A protein has these predicted regions:
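Cysteine-nucleophile amide-bond enzymes
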Residues: 19-451
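Cleavable N-terminal signal peptides
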Residues: 7, 17-18
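Sec-dependent signal peptide recognition
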Residues: 2-10
Length: 451
């Protein structure tokens, strides 16, 4: 009988077979690495090539594989922890699922040394500690000491931080030691994640998934504070031909209002009024291009809409009437100093007033926001660039982001737009050259969007 093992790992669920060795639950290879310095970390490339992959066990029974992988310019030495992964196996009898032993080079507890291929000199040491492999710390030699970086999905939360320690110290240092030595210089608060804290965020996202089949997209459509179908642009009643019994007919902006109303109606017995949502929140210079454009077009529609929606929700929750300028709803944090691009490292632009953040920074930004504020979700106003006239930038569309960490502490983000759910990857692909301004809202356990 022939078996075909799928070339793709269909299930990326790594089984938790590690014993907990330190306070962070990260498998620790430090005692093993002490014995590898001469034969793996400092030996010439030709000698390292002669080393066969090794399996070693630490004092608490955790297994690690030591191996070398070559690239065009460097050779990488991995000390990788044991894990098990489910794969689908196809044969003439059908499909079965098998559990296979692996040693992933980027799983929590993995340690990586990168060396230059020509000189053999060390370039960096990387510690993987998060469920998301694109979140890690790395150390780089600088003279007699080492500098440290903390990266989150290609963005530097810290870069070039002096450690005052010789680079060679990290050949045998445990992750616990790394955290202690850098506790005041690296943002370790981003790894203090408690999955149970995201219940309200996940519950709201699940409700929207259940209700989305009832939503149909209609241009310029919303429900007013009395639940009557009206036009956003005029406030006048909509025509019967645009309504469908048993369906929620809204535009993209009306969809976000429907979400906001689902939070406040259980609290106040009412919905948000239309007129305050259209109040301008930004003034453009009349002599500038955007100012001239704003005289003719509503170039800040979705920007004003999401800001005023969030301000309205805060007003109902607190019992105080907040105008946008006093509400503090905008997300303006600057957690990154640089980003890793195809052309190398460049300084991060971060937040731009009344424009928001580049969509390219959105995933690491939402990761940080979720780690810091597990009770929040976000409305986003999308500032699009006209493909034919790049100087024209308009806030016309909007969406909702629900970031959280799952039970395995892996980062997830549910995106809802125009009455439908979309993957973050799809959102990124569609709007990667644009920017998004985020406003924050508290997730509600009692969330009941209207029928």
């Amino acid at each position: 009988m022939k078996k075909i093992v799928s070339g793709v790992l269909f299930s990326l669920f790594v089984l938790p077979v590690f014993a907990l060795y330190n306070s962070f639950g990260v498998p620790d290879s430090s005692e093993i690495r002490k014995e590898l310095v001469e034969s793996w970390f400092e030996a010439p490339l030709q000698n390292v090539r002669m080393n066969r992959p090794e399996i070693r066990t630490n004092s608490v029974g955790q297994k690690f594989q030591i191996r070398m992988e070559e690239t065009e310019d460097s050779f990488n030495i991995f000390v990788a922890p044991y894990a098990r992964i489910e794969v689908d196996v196809y044969s003439d009898k059908g499909k079965t699922t098998e559990v296979q032993d692996i040693y992933p080079g980027d799983a929590p507890g993995s340690w990586l040394l990168v060396r230059d291929k020509k000189s053999g000199k060390p370039l960096r040491i990387r510690y993987y500690f998060a469920a998301d492999s694109e979140v890690f710390v790395q150390f780089l030699p600088s003279g007699k000491t080492a500098l440290c970086d903390y990266l989150i999905f290609g963005c530097y939360a810290a870069k070039g931080v002096p450690t005052g320690l010789p680079f060679g110290r990290f050949y045998s240092s445990s992750f616990d030691q790394v955290v202690r030595w850098t506790e005041n210089s690296l943002p370790w608060q981003y790894m203090q994640i408690h999955p149970d804290d995201y219940h309200a965020v996940q519950q709201m996202a699940n409700v929207l998934k259940e209700r989305n089949p009832d939503v149909i997209l209609v241009d310029d459509a919303m429900y007013d504070d009395e639940g009557k179908p009206v036009y956003i642009s005029s406030g006048k009643p909509r025509k019967n031909g645009e309504l469908e019994e048993g369906k929620i007919s809204v535009s993209g902006a009306g969809y976000l209002k429907w979400i906001a109303d689902g939070i406040i109606e259980p609290l106040a017995g009412a919905r948000l009024k239309r007129d305050p949502l259209l109040e301008p929140t930004v003034e453009y210079k009349k002599t500038g291009f955007q100012g001239i454009l704003s005289e003719k077009y509503a170039i800040s529609f979705s920007l004003d809409w999401v800001r005023n929606l969030a301000s309205g929700v805060i007003s109902v929750r607190t019992g105080r009437n907040y105008l946008y300028k006093d509400s503090g709803v905008d997300v303006t944090i600057e957690p990154f100093c640089a980003e890793l691009t195809e052309k190398g490292i460049r300084n991060s632009f971060g937040y731009i007033e009344n424009s928001g953040y580049s969509v390219k920074m959105l995933k690491p930004l939402l990761y940080v926001l979720a780690a810091q504020n597990p009770q929040l979700f976000y409305f986003g106003a999308i500032r699009e660039t006209d493909r034919r006239s790049p100087e024209v930038k308009i806030f016309n569309e909007c969406c909702a982001f629900f970031p959280y960490f799952d039970s395995q502490k892996r980062f997830k983000c549910e995106v809802f737009k125009d009455g439908s759910q979309m993957s973050f990857e799809e959102f990124f692909s569609r709007y990667c050259i644009d920017s998004v301004l985020l406003v924050k809202l508290h997730a509600a356990e009692e969330f009941y969007p209207a029928d």
